[in-house]
Structures are given as structure tokens and as C-alpha cells.
Amino acid sequence: EGALSQRELELLVLPYCHVENMGRYLDYGERHPELTTEQVATEVNIGLDRPFYQGIQMVEDPDSQTVLVNKYHQLSPDYKPDLVRMGTAYTYGTAYLQREAWEQFKAMADQARTEGIRLWNVSSYRSYGTQERVYDRYVSQDGQSLADTYSARPGSSEHQTGLTIDCNTIDDAFGETEEAKWLAAHCADYGFIIRFPDGKENITGYQYEPWHIRYVGVDVAKEIQKYGLTLEEYLGVDSVYAEPWQG
């Protein structure tokens, strides 16, 4: 057999190189010569060499606090986490979250209130069936291509985990409000991240959503905030960014 190429040698020394992905790395690198070897490995590991919703894997650890649910990782239709009802002063209508996420959201909202900021939930846990109805409505309204940029297909929504909250409003103008600025600055202190940040649409597959927060625990949230990552990049699903906290 012939000698390994320079790109293969560069890939093999990366701690997050998966040999079984080598063919995908090489193909993706050829299609994207502007990317570094590290970026090629990172993006292929995330799944970005494939169109969204292709090569979907079923989530194996749905109860993990850092569970990855996205356009490549899907929850089963019958998955339902352990939930508690959110206090009525903190939500619009009846709503449910996992207990720790609820307790931390309550603590965050209480602190925000002392600083003149009001935060409340407008959408938290959604069942598979509810998400199916939400998504179908958006597809009917805007067509599938556009709907896919702002709404998850059933099974691919983080809302099904009971770890996600839409705060205050799902209006693009929210990002310019004092509430949104406070949320972005302080949510990591309570274990939340802005799940779909501005400028990361190619990685998350979603438009910027300054209102959409996801509970991952304080330590992980602070790392994600510090390095300006998405959850996909943090988990890596093995990435160029792994070293600061894994090394």
C-alpha cells in the first residue's frame, strides 16, 4: 500500500481523530480547502459533512445533563424525562422542566428581578407529539426549508429533554433588550447556555435565538461561555476545542 498523505498524518495525531471517519475527513477536506485539518476533523465529528437530518443517530443517554439533541441526534418518540411543574409566577401558562433546571431557572429569575430584570418562561418541556404539531404548523406556514431553520423536527427538539426554556418572547427583537443582555451575561452562572448563538448557524442548523436557553450544569456552561462555543463544539462531538478542559 502507498504511503499516508500529509493530511492523513495530520489527522492521525489529533486526539479527537476517529480512524473510522478517515474517508469522510479526506472527502470533506477536499471539498473545503479553506479549513484547517483541525476544523475538518471537528466538523466531520459533529456531522457537518452530511446534510442535516441525514445519518441520524438515536440518543443513547437521554437523561444526561449534557445530552446532545439536534439534527443528527434524535430522541425516541416515547422518551419523557422526570418533570416538575414550574411555579406560576415564573411561566406563561402551565409548564414543566426537570427539577434541577427549574430550581436554577427560579434562582436566576429571582436574582434578575433584584436587578430590575424580569425573566419568565414561554415554552419549556414539549412532548414528541406536541413538537410534531408545532413543526407541522410551521411547515404549512413557511414551507419545510424555512421551517427547518427555526423549528426542530419531532425527536430532534431539545424541548423534549425538559432542560430547555424559551424566555420572555420568541421575537428577534428580544436580542436587543436589557433582558436578553442580562441573560447572555449571567445565564452560565446558573448552568444555562444560549443554545443557538449568533454566527454559529452553520453548526447548530438554527437561526440565532437569544431567548432559547439550555441547562447543562454550571461547570459546563461556564466553559462554553468562556470559549464561545456551541454545545456541539464543546462535546466536540470531539473537537479542536477539547483540549482546554480535557487536557
What is each of the regions a protein language model found here?
Residues 1-124, 128-247:
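Extracytoplasmic cell-surface/polysaccharide-interacting catalytic and binding patches
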